[in-house]
């Protein structure tokens, strides 16, 4: 498979340029200031303090590697189902071209429940972070594979200045070193290689020795069964970002409950 990540990043840069022409920074700042914030990190910590897994449940229609995951896709219904069945937070795909996501999906999901929401997208510019705040996101994702360290630090500082939480995502040990220069307590280990889309949960287990005690590991991708959850919890990984396994189920929230509770 060709290098998907490079293609996505190129598209994102074009999208940012177009968005800046259509919605000037000052207009976006006005929208952002009108939005309330929910405590993303606090919601995860509360689950862990109660001895429960902290699940970031994903609202995702499709992916480049798997195609359409869910034909009947109603973000508000999915969000309510997740909230009812014990999710700590939501993750909503807003990328249109590769994941068939939408800003509207994030707005609808957030309005349907009280859970904090992560904007799941490929952030390459501070403008997208202000966009995230304006659409109602409570957290953003920074992907180490897509950013150099100085830019990642700059984007994190801007997100924090807006009150947004940051989940930094890594896939290998070099990226982990990069991520640990940030201030965020949330370190996502993506079991899927974004350059090949190959997936193994061993990726998380192999990097745990690098993570300081003051960081929370979120294992991402490839968590498909109760056995996968048990493997992670036995290794003291208690925060999860899961999408595909729930999206393929008749009722996403019930699938979450079966897998985690």
Swiss-Prot record:
- Which Pfam family is an annotated match for this chain, by its short name? IGPS
Name-wise, this protein is Indole-3-glycerol phosphate synthase
Q: For this entry, list what GO says about its biological process.
A: L-tryptophan biosynthetic process
UniProt keywords, alphabetically: Amino-acid biosynthesis, Aromatic amino acid biosynthesis, Decarboxylase, Lyase, Tryptophan biosynthesis
Cystine pairings recorded for this chain: none
Q: What is its EC number?
A: 4.1.1.48
Give a yes or no for keyword Amino-acid biosynthesis in this entry.
yes
Q: Which GO terms describe its molecular function?
A: indole-3-glycerol-phosphate synthase activity; phosphoribosylanthranilate isomerase activity
Signal peptide positions are none
Name the InterPro entries on file. Aldolase_TIM, Indole-3-glycerol_P_synth, Indole-3-glycerol_P_synth_dom, Indole-3-GlycerolPSynthase_CS, RibuloseP-bd_barrel
Q: What CDD domains does the record point to?
A: IGPS (cd00331)
Q: Which HAMAP family match?
A: IGPS_B
Q: What is the lineage of its organism?
A: Bacteria, Pseudomonadati, Pseudomonadota, Betaproteobacteria, Burkholderiales
Q: Which catalysed reactions does the entry list for this protein?
A: 1-(2-carboxyphenylamino)-1-deoxy-D-ribulose 5-phosphate + H(+) = (1S,2R)-1-C-(indol-3-yl)glycerol 3-phosphate + CO2 + H2O
Q: Which pathway does this polypeptide act in? A: Amino-acid biosynthesis; L-tryptophan biosynthesis; L-tryptophan from chorismate: step 4/5
Q: Which family does it belong to?
A: Belongs to the TrpC family.
The keyword Kinase belongs to this UniProt entry's keyword annotation: no
């Amino acid at each position: 498979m060709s290098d998907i990540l490079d293609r996505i990043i190129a598209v994102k840069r074009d999208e940012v340029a177009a968005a800046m022409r259509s919605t000037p920074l000052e207009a976006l700042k006005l929208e952002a200031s009108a939005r309330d914030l929910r405590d993303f990190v606090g919601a995860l910590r509360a689950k862990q303090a109660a001895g429960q897994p902290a699940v970031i449940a994903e609202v995702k229609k499709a992916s480049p590697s798997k195609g359409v995951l869910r034909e009947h896709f109603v973000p508000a219904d999915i969000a309510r189902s997740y909230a009812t069945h014990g999710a700590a937070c939501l993750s909503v795909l807003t990328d249109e071209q590769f994941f068939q996501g939408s800003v509207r999906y994030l707005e609808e999901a957030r309005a349907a429940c009280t859970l904090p929401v992560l904007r799941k997208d490929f952030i390459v510019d501070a403008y997208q972070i202000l966009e995230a705040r304006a659409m109602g996101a409570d957290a953003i994702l920074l992907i180490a594979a897509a950013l150099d360290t100085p830019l990642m630090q700059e984007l994190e500082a801007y997100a924090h200045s807006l009150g947004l939480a940051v989940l930094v995502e890594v896939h290998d040990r070099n990226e982990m070193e990069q991520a640990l220069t940030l201030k965020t307590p949330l370190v996502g280990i993506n079991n899927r290689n974004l350059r090949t889309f190959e997936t193994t949960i061993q990726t998380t287990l192999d990097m745990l020795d690098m993570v300081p005690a003051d960081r929370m590991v979120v294992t991402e991708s490839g968590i498909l069964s109760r056995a996968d959850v048990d493997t992670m919890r036995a290794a003291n990984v208690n925060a999860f970002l899961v999408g595909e396994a729930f999206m393929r189920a008749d009722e996403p929230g019930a699938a979450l409950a079966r897998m985690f509770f």
